[in-house]
Swiss-Prot record:
Single Gene Ontology MF annotation: magnesium ion binding
A Gene Ontology biological process term: acetate metabolic process
Family note: Belongs to the acetokinase family.
Name this protein carries in UniProt: Acetate kinase
The species this protein was found in: Histophilus somni (strain 2336) (Haemophilus somnus)
């Protein structure tokens, strides 16, 4: 076992996901979630060396209390002493950050500058960085920021620009940035390994499907397009987000229906997607389990898969070379066999033929090719964003 471990922090506005990984073996020593920050029932749960635990953090507790609890109560002395660096997931790096970086005062300012593009996430990441500096002062120079947007910074101008007045981009940074970059990067590299193709030669379309969902076109190992845009609202149908829609619907909701901007934002971000279409839940498992018996479940899944297939088809065109594979990952991508089946059935024109037995088997941690022999490849690969963060952090710190 490597004696140098990486603590990984993923700070949300009201939660903190954490893990400790060996960046060499990938072994997970600790994982956990602190949630309900600032509320009366703030709490934390964890798994340490296979043993589960949970505790109340106290009314109104937040990031500081959670990290202090991790350090003082959860971590053993040996584990604490083995932490050699800290990796921070940062949602938005703007145009400035195209790769992971050691956190300096300049980087902190860059994360602040990009906060206008991720107003819920980036300020929370900054709190996490500040608290990590306090909790591990001896590791201040060994904190690394890993940006969700970085992998997509290779998109060409024709992919990232909107057809808006160019001044909005030049003066205000209004362009497409994309998200889930760490996941798209990881599974594209894993696909290259499994298919025995060099990382800088792999051509894949990666589908990260979860409560948030996005697809990326990767040509010769580099991202050339992705479905999320200026914010994570653009693109695919998601758990509660609408994805693509006619912008004039917003004018209609405001001018004709009398909805405020705040109400419209809440509708598009929190009340749409699978939740809006089913009028029941944002959980894809409901739509999958009830597909044959509930019209709302069928409606939601059909729209979800149609939108996904349309993106995949368009990305086949822009990759413009032999496509090595379609990759499914994320909670839905890795487990929802019906979603994969319906989506690939839309792509029969391109030769895709699902193997029902392989597709059904590729769930709950099982992976592999799900298409028939001698047909174009679609493959399920579980994502591991934490491992990428750990490896990048180790590479820049050790």
């Amino acid at each position: 076992m490597s004696q140098k471990l990486v603590l990984i922090l993923n700070c949300g506005s009201s939660s903190l996901k954490f893990a400790i990984l060996d960046p060499v073996s990938g072994a997970e020593k600790l994982s956990g979630l602190a949630e309900a920050f600032y509320l009366p029932d703030a709490r934390i749960k964890w798994k340490l060396n296979g043993e589960k635990g949970n505790a109340d953090l106290g009314a109104g507790a937040a990031h500081s209390e959670a990290l202090n609890f991790i350090v003082s109560t959860i971590l053993t002395e040996d584990l604490k002493n083995s932490i050699a660096a800290i990796g921070h997931r940062v949602v938005h790096g703007g145009e400035k950050y195209t790769k992971s970086v050691v956190i300096t005062d300049e980087v902190i300012q860059g994360i602040k500058d990009a906060a206008e593009f991720a107003p819920l996430h980036n300020p929370a990441h900054l709190i996490g960085i500040e608290e990590a500096f306090k909790a591990f002062p001896h590791l201040k120079d060994n904190n690394v920021a890993v940006f969700d947007t970085a992998f997509h910074q290779t998109m060409p101008e024709e992919a990232f620009l909107y057809a808006l007045p160019y001044s909005l981009y030049k003066e205000h940074g209004v362009r497409r940035y994309g998200m889930h970059g760490t996941s798209h990067y990881f599974v594209s590299r894993e696909a290259a390994k499994r298919l025995n193709i060099a990382e800088d030669k792999i051509n894949v379309i990666t589908c990260h499907l979860g409560n948030g969902a996005s697809v990326a076109a990767i040509r010769q190992g580099k991202c050339i397009d992705t479905s999320m845009g200026f914010t994570p609202l653009e693109g695919l149908v998601m758990g509660t987000r609408s994805g693509d829609l006619d912008p004039a619907i917003i004018f209609y909701m405001h001018n004709t229906l009398g909805m405020s901007v705040a109400q419209i934002e809440e509708t598009l971000v929190k009340k749409s997607g699978l939740l809006g279409l089913t009028e029941v839940t944002s959980d894809c498992r409901y739509s999958e389990d009830n597909y044959e018996k509930e019209s709302a479940a069928k409606r939601a899944l059909d729209v979800f898969c149609y939108r996904l297939a349309k993106y995949i088809g368009s990305y086949m065109a822009i990759i413009g070379e032999n496509l090595d594979a379609i990759v499914f990952t994320g909670g839905i991508g890795e487990n929802a066999a019906l979603v994969r089946q319906i989506t690939l059935n839309h792509l029969k024109l391109f030769g895709y033929k699902i193997d029902d037995e392989k597709n059904s088997a590729a769930r709950f941690g099982n992976e592999g090719v799900i298409t028939a022999d001698n047909t174009p490849i679609a493959i399920v690969i579980p994502t591991n964003e934490e491992l990428v963060i750990a490896q990048d952090t180790a590479r820049l710190s050790f």
